[in-house]
Regions:
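Rossmann-like flavin
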Residues: 110, 114-143, 150-153, 297, ...
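Conserved redox-cofactor binding core of oxidoreductases
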Residues: 151-154, 162-211, 215, 326-427, ...
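Extreme N-terminal leader/targeting segments of oxidoreductases
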Residues: 2-16, 48-77, 113, 134-226, ...
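N-terminal FAD cofactor-binding segment of flavoenzymes
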Residues: 248, 255-314, 357-365
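FAD cofactor-binding and catalytic pocket of flavoenzymes
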Residues: 482-612, 628, 656, 664-669, ...
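Near-N-terminal "mature-domain entry" segment
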Residues: 1-111
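Glycine-rich loop(s) and the adjacent beta-strand/alpha-helix scaffold that form part
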Residues: 242-269, 290, 296, 409, ...
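N-terminal Rossmann-like FAD-binding beta1-loop-alpha1 element of flavoenzymes
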Residues: 218-252
């Protein structure tokens, strides 16, 4: 997974004229400058900085790399818009339509194509389109170009594993010595991508002790077990371990691949491409929220930022009393949190904090605000800023190093690169259940094209732990129709602020990309002392950072990147009351409520105050107009005036002039628990209201948003559900 790029042909369907236009857009977004364009008080004009200022995003092979990624990852509708814009800009009349007077010339043929329009005029075109309020689909298309192009130029590495731009921005990859050469799940792993053909896979399954046979008539490999778990993340890992320890033969299906510490890459680009859903770029239908979700063995726990927070008391009270799910106020649930805490080795120890956490802590203390220490499932001396790419030190204890290890040690088998496609259902004639259907297992498919047969896993118990985005899709494909499936989606919307703190700021050492990711937290309280938001710090490689930054000009974006290593970013996270939906085709729609926007605004303003109090010389938001303020010599009145302009309105497809793109790393609620089938897709035991023997064991069962990092909540809930499954299964067998 190193991601080093050799010279090769690029696989996309764009015409050469479209790629030329894409190159012109890339050059406009990240153009070449002479070093004199740099501010006088910037970094000295070393060779690295000179090369950085002279670099252009149009340099080969960047346009083809971006084109290939778009062709592979863009949704069909998005790709249509991309091609329409590129094709129009490839012609003179199309350029006139989109660019107006900026493409006109005094010489024949009087109208330039976009690629031949002078750079300064191209920049004005993009600036105008980023503010366009009427033809928002075209504006959103230019935003898509901006995100993919800018991300690519900083996330890519050459055949030597280098990026020539990193030196100027003082970015170093996380160098890990003595990477543990271990794959703790190896004895229980069947990597279907490595199978030569169906027969080879069959032999691998039987060698692992599974009852597997080939059925040519049904074009299937039939596998029998006690329990099949689709998904290996926070919920699936716990469920697999719990059921396996109860003596059940468990099969885990994971659509991602398995990586040990030596398999992980230190590079941002290949890590996001291989470990995350849609390569780390999964937008809502309106482009307002970018979703990060793990897609590997261990799921989100393999790539999250280690924060371990118990379910808040007020949330448990709401779920038990208002949602009428008593387990959340039980000793059983408290014990489950204790069990999870212990198994993950959670500790509050932190021997050295990162720059961003130092900034959060210093700013809060300067303002007299409370700042809390965030426990982590890693050791106290774990100083790693790249756990979002998988922990190469093997220190962070995700399910791939804890619960799944327990499962494998108790005989569980994990099939990787294998996606659950639909459930095996039949009419329920048992007479012991009110559920109309009975689940008999799962039909799955390997990503390996050499495996031509489907996998038919027959099980007494079937658990969907595909995650909040994919569990509804498995239900839909199986023709389950509870109205709660896919709805009640909560995303913990994240909105960011930034502050630039030069090396001269006392007592704040390090770089923004180094150190423990989340070790501190501040709660933003409203006038009534109710929680409005929390403020934490993120992990942001240079690609993620520049893709998130507002683009107002080519020079501005380069100057921002030269400050990258000392730019501290603060996250405002809210417990969203608004909700969304996972549609049958996987699209995600989502809408914030008015109170959500008010809470986001409160969090943004508080985080800016914290950054100023910590010593930032310049602060700002990630709003599209590049909203920022220099802090040196600023009075309290001037600061308040600036904070009064801070808001978080719609996304690029909305009609607002200055828009914001939020992000989400926590997805919950799309198959929620409910006291009846009108209130939820599953009951308080996690069992589907429609199919006996079908359970859900992931974040999708949570009744509403948690408001804090939900890993502990998901695992504790999964533990309660799976303990109940094991007890009921044992009872039914004995009777």
């Amino acid at each position: 997974m190193e991601g080093k790029r050799e010279e090769r042909k690029y696989n996309h369907g764009f015409f050469s004229s479209e790629v030329n236009t894409l190159a012109a857009i890339a050059e406009t977004l990240f153009p070449p400058f002479s070093p004199t364009c740099q501010e006088e008080n910037q970094t000295p004009k070393t060779q690295a900085v000179r090369s950085f200022m002279e670099a252009s995003a149009s340099e080969l092979p960047i346009p083809d790399e971006v084109a290939e990624k778009m062709w592979k990852r863009a949704s069909p509708k998005c790709l249509i818009l991309v091609r329409i814009v590129l094709l129009l800009l490839s012609t003179r009349m199309g350029t006139l339509l989109i660019c107006g007077r900026h493409c006109l010339d005094g010489k024949w043929p009087y109208i330039n194509r976009f690629s031949t329009t002078p750079l300064a005029k191209r920049e004005k075109v993009l600036q105008a389109w980023f503010k366009q309020r009427i033809f928002t689909p075209i504006r959103a298309t230019f935003v898509y170009f901006k995100v993919d192009i800018l991300y690519n130029i900083f996330a890519r590495v050459d055949k030597n594993g280098e990026n020539q731009l990193w030196e100027a921005i003082e970015y170093d990859i996380d160098k890990v010595e003595n990477v543990p050469n271990e794959r703790p799940l190896q004895k229980g792993i069947v990597e279907t991508l490595h199978a030569k053909d169906t027969t080879h896979l069959l032999n691998s399954l039987t060698e692992k002790g599974l009852q597997a046979t080939e059925d040519p008539r049904e074009n299937a490999l039939k596998i029998k077990c006690d329990a099949v778990v689709a998904g290996s993340g926070c919920g699936g890992g716990v469920a697999a371990a719990t059921l396996a320890s109860a003596g059940m033969k468990v099969i885990v299906l994971e659509k991602g691949e398995y990586y040990g510490p030596t398999d992980y890459s230190p590079f941002e680009g290949p890590s996001l491409e291989n470990l995350y859903e849609s390569g780390g770029n999964h937008p809502s239908v309106d482009g307002q929220i970018m979703i990060l979700a793990g897609s590997t063995v261990g799921g989100g726990s393999a790539v999250n930022w280690s924060a371990c927070i118990r379910t808040p008391e007020h949330v448990l009270r709401e779920w038990a009393e208002e949602c009428k799910i008593p387990v959340f106020r039980s000793k059983e649930y408290d014990s489950a949190m204790d069990m999870v805490w212990k198994r993950l080795g959670v500790t509050e120890d932190c021997n050295m904090e990162s720059l961003q956490n130092q900034v959060l802590r210093k700013g809060c203390r300067s303002l007299g605000l409370q700042v809390e220490t965030v426990p982590r499932n890693s050791s106290g001396d774990h100083y790693c800023g790249s756990c979002g790419y998988g922990c190469r030190r093997g220190d962070k204890k995700g399910t791939d190093r804890t619960w799944l290890v327990d499962a494998v040690n108790n005989g569980a088998i994990i099939l990787t690169a294998c996606k659950a496609e639909r459930l095996m259902l039949e009419p329920n004639r048992t007479g012991t259940s009110t559920r109309k259907m009975k689940c008999l297992g799962v039909i799955a498919k390997s990503w390996n094209q050499n495996i031509t047969r489907k996998l038919q896993i027959e099980a007494k118990v079937t658990i969907s732990a595909c995650g909040t985005l994919h569990t509804p899709l498995l239900m839909y494909s199986s023709r389950l129709n509870n109205p709660n499936i896919g709805r009640n989606l909560h995303l913990h919307p994240v909105t960011m602020t930034w502050g630039y703190l030069p090396d001269s700021v006392p007592d704040l050492k390090g770089k923004s990309s180094e150190g423990g990711i989340i070790t501190s937290l501040h709660k933003v309280l409203g006038p009534d002392n109710k929680l409005q938001a929390i403020i934490e710090t993120p992990s942001m490689g240079p690609g993620h950072f520049i893709a998130s930054c507002p683009w107002v000009s080519g020079l501005d974006i380069k100057q921002r990147m030269l400050k990258f290593s000392r730019t501290a970013t603060m996250l405002t996270i809210i417990r969203d009351r608004g909700s969304g939906r996972v549609h049958t085709d996987g699209r995600i729609s989502y809408k914030l409520e008015k109170s959500d926007r008010e809470n986001i605004r409160a969090g943004l303003r508080q985080s800016l105050r914290v950054l100023v109090a910590a010593g930032a010389v310049e602060v700002g938001t990630y709003q599209s107009d590049g909203q920022k303020m220099r802090c040196t010599g600023v009075s309290d009145e001037e600061l308040d005036e600036f904070l009064g302009t801070v808001s978080a309105d719609g996304g690029p497809l909305s009609g607002v002039k200055n828009w914001t793109v939020h992000s989400s790393a926590h997805q919950m609620g799309s198959c929620r628990m409910g006291i009846n089938e009108k209130e939820g897709a599953v009951d308080e035991n996690g069992e589907s209201w429609e199919a006996q023997g079908l359970y859900v064991c992931d974040a999708s069962v949570l009744p509403s948003a948690v408001g804090f990092n939900p890993m502990i909540t998901i695992m504790a809930t999964a533990y309660c559900i799976s303990k109940g499954i094991a007890a009921r299964t044992k009872k039914s067998i004995s009777s």
